[in-house]
Amino acid sequence: MGKYFGTDGVRGVANKELTPELAFKIGRFGGYVLTKDTNRPKVIIGRDTRVSGHMLEGALVAGLLSIGAEVMRLGVISTPGVAYLTKALDAQAGVMISASHNPVQDNGIKFFGADGFKLTDEQEAEIEALLDKEVDELPRPIGTNLGQVNDYFEGGQKYLQYIKQTVEEDFSGLHIALDCAHGATSSLAPYLFADLEADISTMGTSPNGMNINDGVGSTHPEGLAELVKEKGADIGLAFDGDGDRLIAVDEKGNIVDGDQIMYICAKYMKETGQLKHNTVVSTVMSNLGFYKALEANGITSDKTAVGDRYVMEEMKRGGYNLGGEQSGHIIMLDYITTGDGMLSALQLVNIMKVTKKPLSELASEMKKFPQLLVNVRVTDKKLALENEKIKEIIRVVEEEMNGDGRVLVRPSGTEPLIRVMAEAPTQELCNEYVHRIVDVVKAEVGAE
């Protein structure tokens, strides 16, 4: 991660950290790095429903026009929609303005290359070097060489038609409840599932610029669980603000997370001969029950650091086509180049339809291990990981677990915290293991 770019683009409080002035520079320098080998390059821009989206879009567009780019505004659309359309429309770059599942005051800018993938570390470093230069030496075209801007609000429909053809059957006879987080999928998802002849009930579909992710969406699926039970729906589907995550709810109102969705998809893909190299890529935060369920079905798992970009890197490296995170980022690389909530939802509902099994039955095959995560504020994260007494207590606990549980002790990427997580067959054991480790961490390097 650099000075400006985090694990998912540039993020910050809009108009305070992520200012229009910075957005102009990001548009100008980012656009240049991605399009410098092309005369009159095409760049597409999408945004979610945040009130700050218009402000940042205007600044980004100005920056892009100033290097001679032709800009196409897509309006409100999901992040995977931008990724798909960048490649489908032969654009040299795509830009999404969103802070995903974050609260309304935050916003972010992320780029996609001509291939529809997020930027490499090298590309981000090149943009950062230009941002830090005292003098802007990039070309300044004038007159007829300046870029122009046009709108292509039909892009959302083009994307929906693409993902719709990834399933063979319609969804007639199914009642689907949708929670769109008052975000980018608010008009897209209801149209998609109604077009597939499902009966739909909706919530979180009235964005006003201020209510994105506010008690709704994939980080707050409790309201959707109530809607599913109230309406007698077969499944609930919750997306986040920019539509790259999915959390589901079964017909009984139980929450089905990203691990369970990945397991259901992996098993089905293996049975139908679609799972490449018989492998799923996930992060170290996936539940132990996920790995055990895969193992029981003869499926291999590959673990990465936390973050969908690391999952994607491993998928590309190994030629895998299914990966994701417990949080609901699920990547189906046969179809699209980033996590996609609506695409994942289509595949999940399609599996229900084809197998004629309710979601509760499909999800119950994966037995989740009780999990506890405790954050400990420390004086020095590096010292904590090198401390011999901390290493020793971790070793002792792992020996006691004897393969029937696991411990993960890792530093926070952004705060002076050590995260201590354990999974075990019972919640009591889980609590005991975590607190034994936490006590040693606090005694050795605790900041309080």
From Swiss-Prot:
CDD domains: GlmM (cd05802). It comes from the Bacteria. The keyword Ribosomal protein does not apply. GO terms for biological process: carbohydrate metabolic process; peptidoglycan biosynthetic process; UDP-N-acetylglucosamine biosynthetic process. InterPro entries: A-D-PHexomutase_a/b/a-I (IPR005844), A-D-PHexomutase_a/b/a-I/II/III (IPR016055), A-D-PHexomutase_a/b/a-II (IPR005845), A-D-PHexomutase_a/b/a-III (IPR005846), A-D-PHexomutase_C (IPR005843), A-D-PHexomutase_C_sf (IPR036900), A-D-PHexomutase_CS (IPR016066), Alpha-D-phosphohexomutase_SF (IPR005841). Binds 1 Mg(2+) ion per subunit. The keyword Isomerase applies. GO terms for cellular component: cytosol. Its EC number is 5.4.2.10. Keywords: Isomerase, Magnesium, Metal-binding, Phosphoprotein. It catalyses: alpha-D-glucosamine 1-phosphate = D-glucosamine 6-phosphate. Activated by phosphorylation. The active site is at 100 (phosphoserine intermediate). Its cofactor is Mg(2+). Mg(2+) binds at residues 100, 240, 242, 244. Pfam families: PGM_PMM_I, PGM_PMM_II, PGM_PMM_III, PGM_PMM_IV. The modification Phosphoserine is found at residue 100. GO terms for molecular function: magnesium ion binding; phosphoglucosamine mutase activity; phosphomannomutase activity. Belongs to the phosphohexose mutase family. Catalyzes the conversion of glucosamine-6-phosphate to glucosamine-1-phosphate. HAMAP family: GlmM_B (MF_01554_B). This is Phosphoglucosamine mutase. It comes from Bacillus cytotoxicus (strain DSM 22905 / CIP 110041 / 391-98 / NVH 391-98).
